[in-house]
Amino acid sequence: MTQTRAVGITGTPGTGKKSVSRLLAPKLHRELLELNALAASQSVQDDFGELAVDVNALGRDIRGRRLSGAVVSGHLLADVLKASDVDFVAVLRCDPAVLKRRLSSRGYAHEKVLENVEAELIGVVLDAAVRRFGPSKVHEYDTSRTKPASVARKIELDLRSGLPQTAPWRDWTLGYDSSTRLRSLLSAPRTDPAST
């Protein structure tokens, strides 16, 4: 393997970045840098009680570390790294209905669940990665029904092969046979007294 720059792992929250990257880094004998952990140590709370990340400061911090050869994981990857920082970017994708169940089971607020499901449905993270790093560096992996170890192995094989992305990008909207199913996926449960 000739890669000397970083390998990026990104995706919408809940797609398996942490699990996959923690399995992949040792397979590749590379250091793992988790953007969320680094961001949490630098973040401040905004007026709404959410953590606000200074992506420019995070980018400087990550580049000040041993970025070369590392596996860098996080949904902010395209906001923090430059195209010249990476040789390969794995975008983890997940069927929005599966993602909704995953995030709900983790205790995410319903509003956050819907925000992330919508982002996955329309491919926000994939689009950002392709725009930032270029389509030849970006590879897409469906984690909906695949174990993290299998995803890590597939990424390892693709990385070692050196082949560019060849499959067309996934469009989750094609998997929903009606606008009713799409609306139901993106709607909040009714909480008014009439619904109980």
Residues of each region from the PLM?
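P-loop (Walker A) phosphate-binding loop of NTP-binding proteins
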Residues: 12
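ATP-binding Walker
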Residues: 15
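Walker A/P-loop
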Residues: 18
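ATP-dependent small-molecule kinase phosphotransfer cores
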Residues: 31-81, 168, 173-178
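NTP-dependent small-molecule kinase module
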Residues: 130-196
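A glycine- and Lys/Arg-enriched "phosphate-lid" helix/loop adjacent to the NTP-binding pocket
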Residues: 93-139, 145, 160-163
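Hydrophobic anchor at the beta1->P-loop junction of P-loop NTPases
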Residues: 9
